[in-house]
Amino acid sequence: MGFGMIFYGLILMKNAFESVRGSEEFEKIFLIANADTFKGRFLCVMIGMIVTAIIQSSSAALGVTISLAIVGLIDFPTSVALILGQNIGTTITAVLATLNASTNAKRAALVHSLFNIFGVVYMFFLFNPYIKLVNFLAGFIVSIFNSLYILI
């Protein structure tokens, strides 16, 4: 039942974004925030981080990103850059929770944030090889399934 509700929610978000698909103002945002350039990639990471920090739910932000990708408003590299930003933005919840906490709790939140930031910086510089690898593997897996389908 839980998985069904998740997919139902994704369908609802997809349908909501289909109505905005033709909006020029909405599409301009994603033309500016396109992960094809270094600047655009950085902007996508910042957008993902800010949106996730505001709504304080990386799952909801990821659902929105998936819905935008399904509708075709953003491409795969842009969605990956947004998800990298969401990875940093999700740490704001831990930071906010430790505002009136002990020193050790603040240290744990700081380490959590730094770990995610370093992971995103690491992936930021490996971004293009990662995208190429995923595209290659996706095509490779599809060709394997096509071959198996022909054999069966």
Walk through the language-model features, giving the residues of each.
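Membrane-interfacial helix-loop connectors
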Residues: T52-G89, T98-N104, L110, F127-N128, ...
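Alpha-helical transmembrane segments of multi-pass membrane proteins, especially transporters
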Residues: F3, S23, D36, G48, ...
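Membrane-embedded alpha-helical segments of transport systems
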Residues: I6, L10, I55, L84-T93, ...
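Membrane-spanning helices that line or support transport/gating and their immediate boundary helices
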Residues: L12-V20, T91, V95-T98, P129-F136
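Transmembrane alpha-helical segments and their short flanking loops
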Residues: E24-A35, L99-I152
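Catalytic cores of large soluble enzymes that bind and process phosphate-bearing ligands
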Residues: M1, M5, F17-R21, S57, ...
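Helix-loop-helix hairpins and the membrane-proximal interhelical loops
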Residues: G2-I50, L68
